[in-house]
Amino acid sequence: MIKVGIVGGTGYTGVELLRLLAQHPQAEVAVITSRSEAGVAVADMYPNLRGHYDGLAFSVPDSKALGACDVVFFATPHGVAHALAGELLAAGTKVIDLSADFRLQDATEWGKWYGQPHGAPELLKDAVYGLPEVNREKIRQARLIAVPGCYPTATQLGFLPLLEAGLADPSRLIADCKSGVSGAGRGAAVGSLFCEAGESMKAYAVKGHRHLPEISQGLRLAAGKDIGLTFVPHLTPMIRGIHATLYANVVDTSVDLQALFEKRYADEPFVDVMPAGSHPETRSVRGANVCRIAVHRPQGGDLVVVLSVIDNLVKGASGQAVQNLNILFGLDERMGLSHAGLLP
């Protein structure tokens, strides 16, 4: 049994991680931390987990207790893993970080987007970007895994086949993305209130979103050259979900794009390339660790439209973290993640 610790279990990604691990046959949560909720039983905080964690309570972070775990997940705001990851790695504990702390390879770039100096630049050389569809073999050997963000997951998986094949003009990529309100986190904020977010949709961070450098980094590696990306996120009145509408100009219109995407993801357990002409819906992946993709070429021209949907809390966060856990410990990649999407 894999002994698991979780730092920061009171946010949406934390409780989703608890939900998924409760059904994992090879993982046992031994430690879960929260300074604000120390002493509170997990089952009291989250009634949906009654019967799964009845003996587990939140505790103040303790390096010794966390260091005794085989793996520690960080479901925390940025900056927290900087302070604790090094000590855990020195103790031989694996780290899977759901925050943005180790996603960018450039510490200076990270500081520019997150408004503070990188707290552990010496660890960046050890960090593996945890997108299994790209870095599976590196994940197997990793000590420190940086779980991709929600927008970056949906966007990269949608663009990858085109860029890897050299088909897309990398200088003219557009990602028009929509997110559910849970993507903003569980903290109290006016913009997340029901009366503010309900029955409305808006774009935000058009000037530049923190996920932009992460997406650009991944697409640049896929293309093998510099890329030009316009990324516009939107807030929509739903709880869960990411819908990415992606645009690229292709340099060869004779290629069968449906076949290209199907071949690229044929062996990927959590990427579903839908039949030609499909329009994937966010509700089809709610609660599931799946990215559903459809590729279109309207009017038969050189403009390609890729539709990519995920649950931002599952394939966009906690589910992908568990997928990384399975790969890291040599388990079946699908273990604990074979949930169908919730309908209605």
From Swiss-Prot:
EC number: 1.2.1.38
CC per GO annotation: cytoplasm
Catalytic residues of the enzyme: C150
Catalytic class of the enzyme: oxidoreductase
Organism domain of life: Bacteria
Protein name from the UniProt record: N-acetyl-gamma-glutamyl-phosphate reductase 1
Pathway, per record: Amino-acid biosynthesis; L-arginine biosynthesis; N(2)-acetyl-L-ornithine from L-glutamate: step 3/4
Subcellular location: Cytoplasm
Molecular function per GO: N-acetyl-gamma-glutamyl-phosphate reductase activity; NAD binding; NADP+ binding
Keywords carried by this UniProt record: Amino-acid biosynthesis, Arginine biosynthesis, Cytoplasm, NADP, Oxidoreductase
Family: Belongs to the NAGSA dehydrogenase family. Type 1 subfamily.
Any one biological process term the GO annotation gives: L-arginine biosynthetic process
Its job: Catalyzes the NADPH-dependent reduction of N-acetyl-5-glutamyl phosphate to yield N-acetyl-L-glutamate 5-semialdehyde.
CDD domains found in the cross-reference section: AGPR_1_C (cd23934), AGPR_1_N (cd17895)
InterPro entries: AGPR_AS (IPR023013), AGPR_type-1 (IPR000706), NAD(P)-bd_dom_sf (IPR036291), NAGSA_dehydrogenase (IPR050085), Semialdehyde_DH_NAD-bd (IPR000534)
Catalytically driven reaction(s): N-acetyl-L-glutamate 5-semialdehyde + phosphate + NADP(+) = N-acetyl-L-glutamyl 5-phosphate + NADPH + H(+)
Organism phylogeny: Bacteria, Pseudomonadati, Pseudomonadota, Gammaproteobacteria, Pseudomonadales
Pfam families: Semialdhyde_dh (PF01118), Semialdhyde_dhC_1 (PF22698)
Residue runs in coiled coils: none
UniProt keyword annotation of Amino-acid biosynthesis present: yes
Presence of keyword Iron: no
